[in-house]
Structure formats: structure tokens, C-alpha cells
Swiss-Prot record:
Region listing for Disordered, in residue ranges: 18-104, 123-178, 198-227, 290-355
Protein name per its UniProtKB record: Surfeit locus protein 6
Segments of skewed composition (Basic residues): 44-53, 143-160, 208-218, 290-302
Natural source organism: Mus musculus (Mouse)
Tissue expression notes: Expressed in all tissues tested, including heart, brain, spleen, lung, liver, muscle, kidney and testis.
Function: Binds to both DNA and RNA in vitro, with a stronger binding capacity for RNA. May represent a nucleolar constitutive protein involved in ribosomal biosynthesis or assembly.
Record PTM Citrulline, positions in chain: R106
Length: 355
């Protein structure tokens, strides 16, 4: 800080010295104010030749000559008339006097460094960082840890990127050899297979094809008793039992063989996961429950319909009542207006018994 203060005081003294030097005096114009009397009295004067303006190089040389004679620095004006001329003069002066130019260059560099340092300090203060002397040891340690963590992550990211690049290069270098067997397999496989379930892009089957597949699935020419149409299932079961009874009367052995065959077929269906409904008692109970639920829904629907009709009737009655009230109020207003105007109405005569 002491060095900074010394530099600051030095710069301020230098600026004061430069500002205190007198500027170049303006030359007084020798031109006088002409009047009519002077023109008449005096002899005709010769026209002065226009003096050519000196070039910036000549002016600089003249100034250097004067300063060498007087042993002083050339005076600098605070506001140069032409910025381009002043730049040229500065360049010529720097070329003309190497010692002065070296001194001024050093001073300017020193001043720029000092100002730059002050600017950085102000920026740090504005960011809330400030000088590290005022911070505690814990804060400094935390900053150091954060910096190390950032560097570690950066190194890790670079390593990962390098590994990815190496792997990509290896993949590009190693071409995949496609054997004819693999190509044939890819052509033959028309769909995907997920856990022994073949999923192929086929068109939806027609109605006749579906019926054919259903007949093929039937085992032993015995249609399984499945579904939720309990009445139909009960009728089919009763018909099957009736055929068995008739066959038992004719040939008991044949009937027994058919019954065993039906049982085995039902067992095969159950093994495949098909729910067989071949119990007459359970079918009757399920049918009763279904009929009961249907009756309940029917009653609810009828009740709801009645309620809707009642609501509609109530709205209609209320509307008619409101219309009658409005009509009566309108007639009453008309009567009141007539009474105000002094008219005698038939109703008034009836009330008075004069009609």
C-alpha cells in the first residue's frame, strides 16, 4: 500500500507541473482597423504576400530549437485545435527526442499499471470478494476446497470424453462381419419374439377364418361351457344331461364312456385356463343373481324416469302460475292507471250496485 501511495503522489505532482506550465501566447494581429480617413490620407499600401502555412514537421523543429535554446520543455496546450495535427506532433516529438520519449513512455506504462490495479481492486470489491487479508481462515479453506473440486470434476470430464472418443474410434475401426446364415435368419424372421410369444404383423382374420380356428380348438367335438350367458349355459347343460339319460337307457356302457370322455375334455380345458361352468346348481344361483340385478336396475330406471317426469311437471306448473301472476299484475296496473285518470270502469259500477 505504501508503494501505491507513493506512486499516486508522484503522478499527482507530475500532473500539477504539466498543468502549471504556461501555454503558447497568441500572436497579436498587426492588422489595424481601417477607416475612410486613413484610406484617404495614407498612401496605397502594397499587398502582403500570403505566408504559406508551415507543415507540422517544421513547427515541431522550431519548437525543439526554442526549447533547446531556453533549456525548457515545449509548452503543451490544454486543448489542441486539430486532433490530427496534435497526434502528428506527438509522434514527431517522440521521434525527435529519444530520451524524453523513453521517460514519458515509462511514466505512461507505470500510470496504466497503477490504474489497472485500482480498477481490478474496485471490481473485486463490487463482486464482494475484496482482499484476501480481511477473510477468515475458514472462508479461505472453503474457497480452496471448491477450487480443488472444480479442478477434479474438470479432469474427470476430460478423461470421460477421451475414453468415449477412443471407444468410438475402435468401433469405427472394427467392421461387423455379416455371415450369410445371419442374413437368412433376419429375412426369415418376420416379427418379434417376446418370451416365446410371437408378435407378427398379420392382417386381421376374417369371420370365416375365426370360426374355423374356433372349431379346431374344440377338443373331442365338445364345446366348453364358458361365458356369462347363464341361461344359455344352463339350457346347454340340461340338454347334454338329457342326451346322457337317453343314452343310458339304451346303452349304459356307451353312456358311461361318453360321460368319462366329457369329464376328461373339461379337465383339458381347465388345464389351459378356461373356466368351465358345468355345475347346474351354481348356474341357477348365478342366473337368479343376474335376474335380480336386472330387476333392481329396471326399478331404479323406472323410478328415475318418474322423478324426471314429476320435475318437468312441477316446472311447467310453476311457469304457468308465474305467467298468471304476471297477467293479473299487468291488469291491476292498468286499472290503477285508469283510476288515476278518473275513469269509471264496469267493475266499479258492479261494486257500487249501479249496473
Amino acid at each position: 500500500m505504501a508503494s501505491l501511495l507513493a506512486k499516486d503522489t508522484y503522478l499527482q505532482d507530475l500532473a500539477k507541473k504539466i498543468c502549471a506550465q504556461p501555454g503558447p501566447e497568441r500572436q497579436r494581429s498587426t492588422w489595424g482597423v481601417r477607416t475612410k480617413g486613413s484610406e484617404a490620407a495614407g498612401a496605397p499600401k502594397k499587398k502582403r504576400k500570403k505566408t504559406q502555412k508551415k507543415s507540422p514537421e517544421q513547427e515541431q523543429k522550431a519548437m525543439d530549437h526554442k526549447t533547446k535554446a531556453l533549456g525548457k520543455k515545449p509548452p503543451t496546450s490544454s486543448r489542441p485545435k486539430n486532433p490530427m495535427v496534435s497526434k502528428q506532433e506527438k509522434g514527431l516529438s517522440s521521434l525527435g527526442s529519444p530520451k524524453d520519449s523513453q521517460g514519458t513512455a515509462r511514466e505512461s506504462v507505470f500510470a496504466l499499471d497503477f490504474l489497472r490495479q485500482r480498477l481490478h481492486e474496485k471490481i473485486q470489491l463490487a463482486r464482494g470478494q475484496g482482499s484476501t487479508k480481511e477473510l477468515s481462515a475458514a472462508t479461505l479453506e472453503k474457497r480452496q476446497r471448491r477450487k480443488q473440486e472444480r479442478e477434479r470434476k474438470k479432469r474427470k470430464r476430460k478423461e470421460r470424453q477421451a475414453k468415449q472418443q477412443v471407444a468410438e474410434a475402435e468401433k469405427k475401426e472394427e467392421p461387423v462381419e455379416v455371415t450369410p446364415k445371419m442374413a437368412c435368419k433376419e429375412l426369415q424372421e418376420s416379427g418379434l419374439i417376446f418370451n416365446k410369444v410371437e408378435v407378427t404383423e398379420e392382417e386381421p382374420a376374417s369371420k370365416a377364418q375365426r370360426k374355423k380356428e374356433k372349431r379346431q380348438k374344440v377338443k373331442g367335438n365338445l364345446t366348453p361351457l364358458t361365458g356369462r350367458n347363464y341361461r344359455q349355459l344352463l339350457d346347454r347343460l340340461q340338454a347334454r344331461q338329457g342326451r346322457l339319460d337317453e343314452l343310458r337307457d339304451q346303452d349304459a356302457a356307451k353312456a358311461q364312456e361318453l360321460e368319462a370322455k366329457m369329464k376328461w375334455t373339461n379337465l383339458l380345458y381347465k388345464a389351459e385356463g378356461v373356466k368351465i361352468r358345468d355345475d347346474e346348481r351354481l348356474l341357477q344361483e348365478a342366473l337368479k343373481r343376474k335376474e335380480k340385478r336386472r330387476a333392481q336396475r329396471q326399478r331404479k330406471w323406472e323410478k328415475r324416469s318418474e322423478h324426471v317426469v314429476e320435475k318437468m311437471q312441477q316446472r311447467q306448473d310453476k311457469r304457468r302460475q308465474n305467467l298468471r301472476k304476471k297477467k293479473a299484475a299487468r291488469a291491476e296496473r292498468r286499472l290503477q292507471k285508469a283510476h288515476k285518470k278518473g275513469r269509471v270502469l264496469p267493475q266499479d259500477l258492479e261494486r257500487a250496485g249501479l249496473s
